[in-house]
From Swiss-Prot:
Pfam families assigned to the protein according to its UniProt record, in alphabetical order: DUF2430 (PF10353)
Protein name: UPF0321 protein C569.02c
Phylogenetic classification of the source organism: Eukaryota, Fungi, Dikarya, Ascomycota, Taphrinomycotina
Keyword DNA repair: no
Signal peptide residue numbers: 1-17
Membership in a protein family: Belongs to the UPF0321 family.
Length: 113
C-alpha cells in the first residue's frame, strides 16, 4: 500500500513539474488595465497555464514593455482576456478609461451581462 502511495506521489509530482503556472499580478499592470481586468474577472485572479499561450506572451509584453497605453497594448489586453491573437481591439479612447460600457463593439464579448 505504501509503495502504491509513493508511486502515485511520484506521478503527481512528475505531472505538476510539466505544468507552467503564471499568476497574473494586477499590480504590475497599468492601473487602468488592472482595474478593467479585475472587474471582468470578478476580482478573482487569473492563472496562465502554458508559456506558449498567446495570453502569456501578451501578459509579458504588458508587464515588461509597456511605456504608454496605446492600440498595441489594448490588443495585448484583449489577447490576455480572450486567449485569441488579435490586433483589432481598442479599449481606451485617448487613453482615458470611462468604464467597460465604452469598450468598442469588437470587444463586446469581454463585457459580462
Amino acid at each position: 500500500m505504501l509503495l502504491l502511495f509513493c508511486i502515485c506521489c511520484a506521478f503527481i509530482k512528475l505531472v505538476l513539474a510539466e505544468v507552467n503556472l503564471t499568476f497574473v499580478d494586477y499590480a504590475k499592470l497599468p492601473p487602468k488595465y488592472a482595474e478593467l481586468l479585475a472587474n471582468l474577472t470578478d476580482q478573482h485572479g487569473m492563472v496562465l497555464f502554458d508559456t506558449a499561450d498567446v495570453r502569456f506572451e501578451a501578459y509579458n509584453y504588458l508587464v515588461n514593455n509597456i511605456t504608454e497605453i496605446n492600440t498595441d497594448t489594448d490588443a495585448c489586453l484583449c489577447q490576455l482576456l480572450t486567449g485569441q491573437y488579435t490586433t483589432d481591439c481598442y479599449i481606451f479612447d485617448d487613453s482615458v478609461y470611462e468604464g467597460p460600457e465604452n469598450i468598442n463593439p469588437s470587444t463586446s464579448i469581454l463585457i459580462k451581462d
